[in-house]
Amino acid sequence: MGALDDLRVLDLTQVLAGPYCTMLLADMGADVVKVERPGGDLIRSNPPFVSDGDEEAYGGYFQSVNRGKRSLELDLGTDEDREAFLSLVERADVVVENFKAGTMEKFDCGYETLREHNPDLIYSSIRGFGDPRTGETHRQGQPSFDLIAQALGGVMEITGQSDGPPTKVGPGVGDLFTAVLNAVGILAAVHHRERTGEGQYVDTAMYDSMVSLCERTVYQYSCDGESPTRQGNSHPTLFPYDSFEAADGHVVIAAFADGHWETLCEAMERPDLAADYPDAGSRIANRESLRREIADWTATIDSETLLDLLEGRVPAAPVQNTADIFDDPHIHDREMLTDVDQPGADEQITIAGSPIKMTETMPSPGGRAPLLDEHRAELLDEAGVGTGTNRVESDD
């Protein structure tokens, strides 16, 4: 039993932001129906593959963010499929899409039309620049992807080394953070509907989300009138809070609190530093020289020895790669790696598990991602429009 096992979601999204949002809901038990355009989600054929892309139904990208969903292929441009979709809407709690503003209206399936079929429907969109219903801007006709959102929202300007160019954050935070916020908005709307009976429109823009993610830069600029820029792995108001090279790799140390600083100086056998720089202000004012002192120390010690010296008393960690993560007992104890079947392959694929843990209704990936149109017969039967015939045969 999942916390959301009474929630029916129609997911018209594709690529990353929308599918990740509905994946979070599916992991918590929601019945997520992936309504796919003819030919399916654009990323079904994206690599990597376990062995042979010609044999496998989809790649790891699609598998990772579409696990636990059901699939129905519909062409909303045809009367038959549009009517089938509207029948599904009548039985749904939530509709999610991530098309450019106005796309659903072209099929006469916009929010206002769907509300006529289901007055308490929660309709949610993820767009680069939001929907005119919640605030019209000149950008809303423009396309957007993660890279665009990171560039506009200030993420790239504050990421990278101080003497280097603006740099994209590795994970697609323009998509992923927006997706998480949109899921929060959907659940808030569900709660509101339970109290009032009112459905509503939930709108989350990628650009807006990146500004929210960079909240620190907003108040900094408001206070001093200077645009924050790149500082490598350091922090503008905390020290030491940085990465350092050890004898066998890199570590990060976050010893900005006075007690942590004293413990770090003790491990370095430098009580003079603790005495000379006892407070945050003095450490920040002398951060460059102090960073050199710490870097000279870490360079002579391997990561494991360094962390043993700090004995869990100072926040510190090695910089791990993905192979290290796969070997970390913590990750296995927390069930953060999940093996699922990969249709067309002889072995399973590992995907990231759910980071949301609950004592009574533990979220969990609900099995592999669906084949295109795999659940057509059962979904059309549930919608009361006939069983239909699967356009793509299931491998089950």
UniProtKB/Swiss-Prot annotation:
Organism: Haloarcula hispanica (strain ATCC 33960 / DSM 4426 / JCM 8911 / NBRC 102182 / NCIMB 2187 / VKM B-1755)
EC number: 2.8.3.26
Family membership noted in the UniProt record: Belongs to the CoA-transferase III family.
Keyword tags: Transferase
Protein activity control: Shows highest activity at 4 M KCl. Does not require divalent ions for activity.
Superkingdom of origin organism: Archaea
Active site: D175
Classification via SUPFAM superfamilies: CoA-transferase family III (CaiB/BaiF) (SSF89796)
Subunit structure: Homodimer.
Known catalytic reactions: mesaconate + succinyl-CoA = 2-methylfumaryl-CoA + succinate
Protein name: Succinyl-CoA:mesaconate CoA-transferase
Any GO MF annotation of the entry: CoA-transferase activity
First-level EC class: transferase
Function: Involved in the methylaspartate cycle. Catalyzes the transfer of the CoA moiety from succinyl-CoA to mesaconate to generate mesaconyl-CoA (2-methylfumaryl-CoA) and succinate. Also shows high activity with methylsuccinate as CoA-acceptor, and only low activity with glutarate, acrylate and itaconate. Cannot use other CoA donors like acetyl-CoA, propionyl-CoA, butyryl-CoA or acetoacetyl-CoA.
InterPro entries xrefs: CoA-transferase_III_domain, CoA-Trfase_fam_III, CoA-Trfase_III_dom3_sf, CoA-Trfase_III_dom_1_sf, Scnl_mescCoAtase
